[in-house]
């Protein structure tokens, strides 16, 4: 026969068991939350928004890279500087364009309890499940373009492409008598970048003397991929006047044209990203005429600062634009200085606002409002 004390112990044990079951069920339900899936327009970021609880995770900022192209390395430089300034441990992984490897690397970061993760996805769809788990764990997840993310970085993609396309169209009219064979090196594996190439086609559409002789995505979006694709294109179209795309593939295409002995000073090679090698080519005054800057170390530094703020329980932007600007010989010196000193840019509101625009607010307590749709500031 049970004593009163034993019955009380049993009741307490039962209550505790029920609580644990409820708590486990509640936690599981939380993991099933899907974030913001319906596209919306975020208001301007409020830097004075209330703080919330900080996550109880390691003060580590990790960067999961798709590859080691210059644009990605620039992001890493900015992140490393921010981590140093905010006393965070900085760690990186490189997937070498292998989607399965990236999933394993991100899962390793998640299971080790890193407090902040920035990711440049290889395959956004396959990576999404582990990113959602990472977000729900309480980790800051900053994504370069595709969702899901605590805070998503994008560029106004149509405007970025139009800035390059309009510059090419102007050059064709003024320097090539309105006639040109054009190559567009696209990025079909990342649908979120497609507005760039829509804009380039729109810019060239009204020029009757323009023939787009190739509109194709290289097998790999890097210098080697651009080189290989351009070699193939030159077999069918040995005379090319204009090449447009991301800097890394356009640089590869330029190398292929040089290798074939088909380079001319009046050609127009133009890219996007403001990569170091592209800037060096522009300085030479040769066929590489322009690069549309997406200052990677500047926004990398900003993402690192947001990661540190998140870990302190502060409210950070849900989304951020990196604004495009056309690099010319006249403004390259200032641009290079900004890339080398992104912390100075970030601390100067006037300079920062020429590169970045921030939207929405989110913190650890409101992480159920993570971005799970392809956000763009150009959405109407």
Show the residue positions of the predicted features.
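Hydrophobic alpha-helical segments within soluble ligand-binding/sensing domains
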Residues: 46-48, 102, 153-179, 194-195, ...
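An alpha-beta-alpha
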Residues: 61, 65, 79-81, 164-210, ...
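Hinge/cleft segment of the Venus flytrap/periplasmic-binding protein
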Residues: 30-59, 305-380
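Flexible loop/hinge segments that line or gate small-molecule binding clefts
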Residues: 124-159, 181, 275-284, 288
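Extracytoplasmic "Venus flytrap"
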Residues: 35-78, 82, 90-103, 108, ...
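Hydrophobic alpha-helical
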Residues: 116-135, 199-200, 219-281
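Bacterial N-terminal signal peptides that target proteins for export
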Residues: 2-13
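Periplasmic-binding protein-like
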Residues: 62, 113-121, 140-144, 183-184, ...
């Amino acid at each position: 026969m049970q004593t009163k004390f034993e019955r009380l112990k049993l009741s307490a044990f039962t209550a505790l068991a029920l609580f644990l079951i409820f708590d486990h069920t509640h936690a599981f339900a939380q993991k099933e939350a899907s974030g913001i899936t319906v596209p919306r327009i975020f208001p301007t970021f409020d830097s004075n928004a209330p703080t919330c609880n900080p996550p109880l995770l390691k003060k580590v900022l990790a960067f999961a890279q798709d590859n080691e192209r210059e644009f990605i390395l620039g992001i890493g430089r900015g992140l490393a500087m921010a981590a140093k300034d905010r006393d965070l441990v900085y760690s990186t992984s490189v997937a070498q364009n292998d989607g399965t490897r990236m999933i394993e690397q991100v899962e390793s970061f998640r299971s080790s309890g890193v407090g902040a993760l920035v990711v440049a996805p290889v395959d956004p769809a396959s990576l999404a499940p582990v990113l959602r788990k990472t977000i729900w764990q309480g980790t800051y997840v900053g994504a370069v373009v595709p969702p899901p993310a605590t805070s998503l970085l994008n560029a106004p993609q149509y405007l970025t492409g139009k800035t390059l396309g309009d510059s090419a169209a102007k050059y064709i009219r003024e320097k090539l008598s309105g006639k040109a064979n054009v190559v567009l090196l696209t990025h079909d594996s990342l649908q979120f970048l497609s507005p760039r190439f829509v804009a380039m086609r729109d810019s060239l559409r009204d020029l009757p003397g323009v023939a787009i002789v190739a509109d194709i995505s290289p097998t790999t979006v890097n210098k080697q991929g651009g080189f290989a694709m351009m070699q193939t294109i030159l077999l069918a179209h040995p005379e090319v006047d204009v090449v447009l795309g991301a800097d890394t593939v356009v640089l590869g295409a330029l190398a292929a044209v040089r290798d074939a002995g088909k380079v001319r000073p009046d050609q127009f090679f133009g890219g996007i990203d403001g990569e170091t090698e592209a800037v060096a080519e522009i300085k030479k005054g040769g066929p590489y005429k322009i690069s549309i800057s997406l200052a990677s170390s500047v926004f990398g530094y900003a993402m690192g600062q947001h990661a540190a703020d998140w870990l302190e329980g502060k409210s950070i932007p849900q989304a951020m634009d990196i604004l495009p600007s056309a690099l010319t010989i006249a403004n390259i010196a200032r641009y290079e200085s900004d890339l080398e000193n992104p912390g100075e840019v970030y601390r100067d509101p006037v300079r920062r606002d020429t590169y970045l625009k921030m939207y929405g607010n989110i913190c650890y307590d409101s992480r159920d409002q993570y971005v799970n749709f392809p956000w763009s500031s150009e959405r109407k």
